From Swiss-Prot:
Family in the record: Belongs to the CBF/MAK21 family.
The protein's name: Uncharacterized protein F23B12.7
Cross-referenced InterPro entries: ARM-like (IPR011989), ARM-type_fold (IPR016024), CCAAT-binding_factor (IPR005612), CEBPZ/Mak21-like (IPR040155)
Transmembrane segment boundaries: none
Bias type Basic and acidic residues, positions: 18-27, 798-808
Source organism phylogeny: Eukaryota, Metazoa, Ecdysozoa, Nematoda, Chromadorea
């Protein structure tokens, strides 16, 4: 049987692929989109580990588990090759270069209001398309980096997914710096970490996000634009039909939209963090908010509202910290001040706002800096101040902490405000505060009244009455500078010489009972005022004028009657009544005054004080009285207190003041000389400045800060020789004329120590005998003459720097009955008793008077005064006491140098002090000879060692 051969069927030849070059544009774009979609799907499966080779094991284990990126089988290799092919064909849409900003290549086209806007569904569809393009581009960038950089990029991405928290944050920050457009996922993760309660990583995450947003993501000169406001209808026109460009535009617009949402979430997260109890985290959040507000304009209303609301935080440190932050913002961006004022105004008049929020808000407003261009801003501030002021005063509260701050802010804004006098039509409430509140509130109130009256080209007599009456109150040390500045400005502008003389008399009365720094400042003020007003006005009266006619009449009456009777006579000898008007002219003058009052009342406008109103608080139109009236220290109106014929006996008391500088200043006024002092008396003559010299330490270097707070307490900066340590060689080598009067006894003492030290070293004597020239007994006697106090008072002085420690000899020395020396185990300095001695004369006025009377009866003091006069003539030839040029409360500065030191008025007190020490040395030397020439070191002198206590006999 023959088998038939079957014809072999040849396999059909595969059809040749249609070349892509022959495809149209639409087909090419569709093919690319399909390829990219499949590549994205493959890449997602590959990255998630959904592709497995062992299907049986996968079925047994159930859900797929992520595996390492190892192309173990041909299937995975084919997928990767296909993805690489697609990547090579299409490429990354956004190729960001480090150092450039993404908004530099952004297409900033917004929707035109004239054109019709797309509906919400169309906008959402385009937004989703842009998000898809953004996610796909981020995946392509990750694949490309792994191809180009290899193991380094793979390691970086593995750290982001599997590393520690710190390493993750660092790797994310690097990726966000490299390409912000492809890093929104990392920003979202960091914000989510900040939202977790109780996390300690917030303090580290916040600076990273702050850096990314400010330096890499947010535009500098514009806000972020949401997707809905873009020119979506013009998308085809903007891309010119190019699908790749169209996709890139959608990607960038969607990125900016998502970035705006994430930034707002970041700000809201910071606001929530402020409510947490951790102070460090709160301050870090507030600082970040302030930096974002200063650096970028995005979400400034939300940030500013959060900062202003922080004024009312339960922790008072947070409110104070917020004030500092807002001050920095206002300095860097002055244009934002009006926005800040509006936000604070909403806070100030909001219901249920605590007092602390008002306090910090007004503190910030009161420290703003203004110029002539800020008239509208100042008017807005004045309206806020006066509204709160009326609210507080309406409750009859005079000790409110908010009042001084409001008045201080009003004083700063008033000169720059336009038509500010109309805002302050009724000054009755301000006068109420000036009369019934403490100095902390009264001084700003009086300053505001002075500015108000000065703007109206006159100063009301009512203001002078209030200021004159306020001087009787005890002024605290913190208000010294404000009071002196107000007094100087007021007396400089006053046209009534008689009233200025009355104020000078009152200031001298205050100076007698004040601390040395305030007393010296008052004397300097009087000297400067005398120089400004000229020599024609006599501000200081040293002798009392007696009317010759009154002397004759009094002599005649004293001859007839045994009893003395005092009457006031004018130049012609007519008797004057108590109010200073002749009896026969009294009725006629009263009639004239009443007629003038009727005419003035017609001229005065209601609600405003006029310069011509003689019936109210302006009494200058009545005219000066032509007769001498007795000085009345309790009179209310300084205009009618005639102090021109009353001698300033206070200067005699001040010339014997225990503080050398005060004594010489007073003597300069008595001799009609100008007080030459350019330093800061309120700082240089304080008790602490005096005690700091005994501490023998150099002052701390004060770092000068620029661009800091507007209102800041000025740090004390010693000038001239006061900067030198009293134990240094540079200090002891200074001449006597170069040393301030209140330090000459220290200079003499330390100089003598240096000389004795050299002599003792040459002779080989003990070091503890260096203080032989001045013993504790001499200091006790000297202090007793200036400040006699209670016996058995103890005070500590640390002389360890000069004498060193010599413990072996302490037990060998015996105590003497004159001085009881107690050696302390430590070197702590206790100067409480010395403090009491310095303050004793200021606390007990009666005791001071007694001391001054004793000085008048002391013959040695009288001789010393004669010697002081001789020394004063020599001192005038040496030049002024110069030093560092520093402005004082009077607005001028001292331009002299250290070489010109020597002609200051207060040098005489130091000479007197040194001469008294010499007299005491001679007396002590005589006593030492009688006792057999004992060493003073063993009789209570200054030994080597730490702090020593000296008991007075």
């Amino acid at each position: 049987m023959k088998l038939k051969k079957r014809p072999m069927k040849l396999a059909a030849k595969p059809k040749p692929k249609q070349p892509t070059e022959k495809l149209g544009k639409a087909q090419k774009m569709k093919l690319k989109e399909d390829n990219l979609a499949s590549a994205e799907k493959i890449m997602a499966q590959f990255e998630s580990g959904a592709v497995h080779t062992n299907k049986k094991k996968q079925a047994q284990n159930g859900a797929a588990k992520p595996v390492a990126h190892k192309p173990a089988n041909p299937e995975n290799s084919n997928q990767k090759r296909q993805f690489k092919k697609i990547l090579g064909q299409d490429g990354i849409l956004v190729k960001h270069q480090e150092g450039t900003k993404w908004y530099s290549y952004q297409i900033d086209h917004v929707h035109d209001e004239k054109t019709e806007k797309m509906n919400a569904s169309e906008i959402q569809k385009l937004l989703e398309e842009g998000k898809d393009e953004m996610a796909q581009d981020a995946a392509l960038l990750q694949t490309k980096e792994k191809q180009d950089n290899g193991s380094e990029a793979s390691w970086l991405y593995s750290v982001i997914s599997k590393g520690t928290a710190t390493d993750k944050r660092t790797a994310m920050q690097l990726q966000m710096h490299k390409s912000p457009v492809h890093s929104l996922e990392y920003i979202e993760k960091l914000i989510a970490s900040c939202k977790k309660q109780g996390t300690r990583d917030v303090v580290d995450i916040i600076p990273i996000l702050e850096d990314v947003f400010i330096n890499h993501c947010l535009p500098e000169n514009r806000k972020l634009i949401p997707f809905s406001k873009r020119a979506l209808r013009e998308l085809t026109e903007l891309s010119s039909g190019n699908q790749r460009l169209r996709r890139k535009i959608l990607l960038m617009w969607a990125f900016e939209h998502e970035l705006k949402i994430l930034y707002q979430q970041f700000i809201e997260t910071l606001v929530e963090i402020i409510k947490r109890p951790l102070e460090e985290v709160i301050k870090r959040s507030l600082k970040t908010l302030a930096n974002c507000l200063m650096g970028r304009p995005e979400s400034e209303n939300l940030i500013l509202s959060a900062l202003v609301n922080a004024f009312g935080h339960p922790n008072y440190k947070i409110g104070a910290f917020t004030v500092v932050l807002l001050e920095g913002i206002s300095r860097k961006h002055p244009a934002m001040r009006i926005v800040m004022v509006e936000e604070i105004e909403r806070l100030a008049f909001r219901k249920n706002v605590n007092e602390r929020a008002h306090l910090y808000a007004m503190t910030f407003l009161s420290q703003m800096k203004f110029s002539k261009k800020d008239s509208d801003l100042c008017c807005r501030l004045m309206s806020i101040y006066l509204s709160l002021f009326k609210t507080i005063v309406g409750k009859k509260i005079t000790d409110n902490r908010l009042l001084p701050i409001i008045l201080a802010g009003a004083n700063r804004a008033f000169p720059f405000a336009k038509d500010a006098d109309k805002l302050l039509e009724d000054v009755k409430d301000v006068y109420f505060l000036a009369h019934n509140s403490n100095y902390r509130t009264a001084i700003p109130a009086l300053k505001l009244l002075f500015q108000f009256h000065k703007m109206n080209d006159y100063v009301s007599d009512r203001f002078y009455n209030a200021l004159y009456r306020k001087l009787l109150d005890n002024c605290p040390a913190g208000a010294y500078a404000q009071l002196l500045k107000l007094m100087f400005d007021t007396m400089k502008e006053d046209s009534s010489a008689q009233r200025v003389r009355t104020f000078v008399k009152r200031l001298l009365q205050v100076a007698v009972n004040s601390q040395p720094d305030f007393t010296a400042s008052i004397l300097i003020l009087i000297s400067r005022l005398q120089k400004l007003r000229g020599t024609t006005e006599k501000l200081v009266v040293l002798s009392k004028d007696i009317d010759p006619a009154a002397r004759v009449v009094a002599q005649m009456q004293n001859d007839e009657d045994d009893e003395e009777r005092y009457v006031d006579l004018d130049v012609e000898g007519n008797e004057i009544s108590r109010n200073g008007v002749k009896k026969e002219e009294k009725e006629e003058e009263d009639i004239v005054i009443e007629e003038n009052e009727d005419e003035d009342k017609k001229k005065v406008q209601p609600g405003k004080l006029g310069a011509s109103s003689s019936g109210g608080w302006v009494h200058r139109s009545i005219g000066a009285r032509g007769a001498k009236t007795p000085y009345d220290s309790v009179a209310r109106n300084p205009l009618f207190v005639d102090a021109s014929h009353t001698a300033d006996s206070e200067l005699l008391l001040l010339s014997k003041h225990y503080h050398p500088s005060v004594a010489v200043f007073a003597k300069a006024l008595m001799e009609g000389r100008e007080i030459n002092y350019g330093g800061e008396a309120l700082n240089d003559f304080t008790l602490m400045a005096f005690l700091d010299r005994f501490a023998f330490r150099n002052p701390k270097d004060v770092t000068k800060t620029t661009g800091t707070r507007i209102v800041r307490k000025k740090a004390h900066d010693p000038w001239g020789v006061r900067k030198l340590a009293v134990g240094s060689n540079e200090y002891t080598q200074k001449r006597r004329e170069e040393i301030p009067a209140d330090e000459r006894f220290l200079h003499r003492y330390t100089s003598s120590l240096q000389k004795e030290k050299k002599v003792k070293k040459e002779n080989g004597d003990d070091d503890w005998e260096y203080a032989e020239s001045v013993s504790s007994a001499e200091f006790d006697q000297l202090l007793e003459r200036f400040e006699p106090g209670e016996l058995n008072e103890e005070f500590d002085i640390d002389y360890s720097k000069e004498f060193g420690a010599e413990k072996s000899k302490r037990n060998k020395k015996k105590d003497v009955e004159e001085d009881d020396v107690d050696m302390d185990e430590d070197d702590d300095i206790d100067l409480n008793d010395l403090n009491e001695e310095e303050d004793g004369g200021m606390e007990d006025d009666d005791e001071d008077d007694g001391d001054m009377d004793d000085d008048d009866e002391d013959d040695e003091d009288a001789e010393d005064d004669d010697e002081v006069d001789d020394d004063d003539e020599d001192d005038d030839e040496d030049g002024g006491f110069g030093g560092k040029s520093s402005a004082n409360i009077f607005g001028d500065a001292d331009e002299s140098s250290d070489e010109e030191i020597g002609a200051n008025d207060y040098e005489m007190a130091g000479d007197k002090f040194a001469e008294m020490l010499e007299d005491l040395e001679e007396d002590d030397g005589k006593r030492g000879k009688k006792k057999g020439g004992k060493k003073r070191g063993s009789t209570g002198g200054f030994k080597r060692g730490g702090a020593k206590k000296f008991r007075k006999r």
